[in-house]
A protein has these predicted regions:
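Arg/Lys-rich, positively charged N-terminal/basic patches that mediate binding to nucleic acids
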Residues: 1-28
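Residues that recognize and position ribonucleotide moieties
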Residues: 2-3, 55-57
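ATP/adenylate-binding site constellation spanning eukaryotic-like Ser/Thr protein kinases
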Residues: 6, 51, 79-82
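Residue-level signal for pocket-adjacent positions within structured domains
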Residues: 11, 38-41, 80, 84
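Non-catalytic effector/regulatory segments
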Residues: 1, 35-36, 69
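Enriched for short, Lys/Arg-rich terminal
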Residues: 15, 21, 59-63, 67-90
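A short, surface-exposed loop/turn module that caps and links secondary-structure elements
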Residues: 30-56
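Conserved short hydrophobic interaction patches
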Residues: 27-31, 82
Length: 90
């Protein structure tokens, strides 16, 4: 699947530790190689009526948040530790 990133996502990714940046890179390679959301590991739709088309992927204690756009591309919005991730996303 194709994806684009927000400025906030790029900034948050730069602030990750080296180990978590490597894990994120592996996850992004997996995203590029998959064809459907159901093939992404640990991917779940966000709950709530205002969160339609918003998803998160769990990797360790970190979460990657994205929105599925109408053309089928993923818009990566945020990445960060589980604790405060859900306060910021979506």
């Amino acid at each position: 699947m194709n994806y684009t990133t927000s400025a906030h996502f790029r900034k948050a990714a730069r602030q990750l530790s080296d180990e978590n940046r490597k894990r994120l890179a592996i996850l992004l390679n997996t995203v590029e190689e998959t064809q459907t959301l159901s093939n992404l590991p640990n991917c779940k739709e966000m709950q709530g009526k205002n969160n339609k088309d918003y998803y998160r992927i769990r990797f360790g204690n970190y979460r990657l948040g994205f929105k599925l756009q109408t053309d089928g591309t993923l818009f990566l919005i945020d990445v960060g530790p589980r604790g405060d991730f859900y306060n910021r996303f979506p």
